[in-house]
């Protein structure tokens, strides 16, 4: 059985990955991971694919151990891993709570790294890993300091890992979207208002995910949707 594991699967980009991956014939079952069981179950009923609902908070280390034990017991053949769980808080570093700032590192970096490590032994030749980073990874962002730094980690870790795993014919793609029309900003902008100009670059989740899957299939190390975000990446090389 060829399994896809998708974190952050209860909303936004993660939910869209579930829907689009469910249409792929090479995947037999989707493991959906997120905190909200009810939402996962609702989504699972709408896709024409066998699903396993795993309701857990990846910020809790005991849950990572629980997932490790599940993998050891079931020994799935993982064809695709999508690390989409993550969040950001937009406010000055000194004005945020320590719990918020460390939480971003726990979910965006540590949990992503742990899941990647735990899943690799179950991946075969031709396997794919998609890590959701952000255009915020391209340069430091005041007011979004920890988030942008955490996504820089995701980008650089993914690119390095892609080089390491090529000999095993497992390919890693870092997805670096700009603003996407999801609930992300309902959480991130509690501390401050999203810059108004970003609304003009807002992309749809289906567009970003479709491009990400296509780029992963093409064995690209980075997936960027939209000319404006490509231009941003190009310009940051000179800053």
Give the positions of each predicted feature.
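Conserved NAD(P)H cofactor-binding loop of Rossmann-fold oxidoreductase domains
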Residues: 84-89
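Active-site helix of classical SDR
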Residues: 116, 150
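Conserved glycine-rich cofactor-binding loop
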Residues: 10-11
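Substrate-binding pocket helix/loop in short-chain dehydrogenase/reductase
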Residues: 92-102
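C-terminal helical subdomain
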Residues: 174, 195-233
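Conserved glycine-rich Rossmann-like NAD(P)H-binding loop of the short-chain dehydrogenase/reductase
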Residues: 22, 26-42
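Residue(s) in the substrate-gating loop at a strand-loop-helix junction
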Residues: 134
């Amino acid at each position: 059985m060829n399994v896809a594991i998708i974190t952050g699967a209860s909303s936004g980009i993660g939910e869209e990955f579930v829907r689009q991956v469910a249409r792929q014939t090479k995947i037999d079952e989707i493991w959906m991971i997120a905190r909200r069981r009810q939402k996962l179950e609702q989504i699972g009923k709408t896709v024409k694919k066998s699903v396993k609902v795993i309701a857990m908070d990846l910020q809790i280390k005991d849950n990572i151990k629980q997932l490790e034990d599940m993998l050891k017991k079931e020994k799935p053949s993982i064809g695709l891993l999508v690390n989409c769980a993550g969040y950001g808080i937009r406010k000055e570093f000194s004005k945020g709570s320590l719990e918020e700032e460390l939480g971003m590192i726990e979910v965006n970096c540590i949990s992503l790294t742990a899941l990647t490590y735990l899943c690799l032994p179950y991946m075969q030749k031709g396997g794919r890993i998609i890590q959701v980073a952000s255009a915020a990874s391209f340069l430091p962002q005041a007011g979004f300091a920890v988030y942008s730094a955490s996504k820089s980690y995701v980008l650089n870790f993914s690119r390095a890992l892609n080089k390491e795993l090529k000999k095993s014919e497992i390919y890693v793609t870092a997805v670096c979207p700009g603003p996407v029309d999801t609930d992300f900003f309902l959480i991130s902008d509690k501390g401050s208002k999203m810059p108004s100009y970003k609304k003009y670059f807002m992309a749809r989740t289906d567009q970003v995910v479709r491009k990400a899957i296509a780029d992963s299939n093409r064995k690209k190390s980075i997936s960027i949707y939209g000319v404006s975000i490509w231009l941003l990446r190009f310009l940051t090389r000179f800053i």
